[in-house]
Amino acid sequence: NAIFSKKNFETLSEAFSVFQTLKYLAILGGVTFLAG
């Protein structure tokens, strides 16, 4: 059970990491759009 929880946590961290990257790219794109 502990192993499953750890694996589950890693999956969540990975998903959050991807989300953060997408959010950053979206903000960057928005700023570029406004500046352009």
Curated annotation (Swiss-Prot):
<dbReference type="GO" id="GO:0005789">
    <property type="term" value="C:endoplasmic reticulum membrane"/>
</dbReference>
<protein>
    <recommendedName>
        <fullName>Dolichyl-diphosphooligosaccharide--protein glycosyltransferase subunit 2</fullName>
    </recommendedName>
</protein>
<comment type="similarity">
    <text>Belongs to the SWP1 family.</text>
</comment>
<comment type="function">
    <text>Subunit of the oligosaccharyl transferase (OST) complex that catalyzes the initial transfer of a defined glycan (Glc(3)Man(9)GlcNAc(2) in eukaryotes) from the lipid carrier dolichol-pyrophosphate to an asparagine residue within an Asn-X-Ser/Thr consensus motif in nascent polypeptide chains, the first step in protein N-glycosylation. N-glycosylation occurs cotranslationally and the complex associates with the Sec61 complex at the channel-forming translocon complex that mediates protein translocation across the endoplasmic reticulum (ER). All subunits are required for a maximal enzyme activity.</text>
</comment>
<comment type="subunit">
    <text>Component of the oligosaccharyltransferase (OST) complex.</text>
</comment>
<keyword id="KW-0472">Membrane</keyword>
<comment type="pathway">
    <text>Protein modification; protein glycosylation.</text>
</comment>
<dbReference type="GO" id="GO:0006486">
    <property type="term" value="P:protein glycosylation"/>
</dbReference>
<keyword id="KW-0256">Endoplasmic reticulum</keyword>
<keyword id="KW-0812">Transmembrane</keyword>
